[in-house]
């Protein structure tokens, strides 16, 4: 299991466009990816669950990666977050 945190920089937080791209990306990876904010969490493959986290600009999210090639999945997700959020 790998974990890391990311501070959201996008002015709109996690909204439809980047959430949709994240879901599409997560479905191509062989790891289970979960995003958490506070005591709420959501699978990175579920669009509405991600949007319901209510992540805004400046919020810190925790990303947990389990199974498959965790190191590769972490690199891919970290790169996506930096580029899109």
Predicted segments with their positions:
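C-terminal structural segments of small proteins and small subunits
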Residues: 51-85
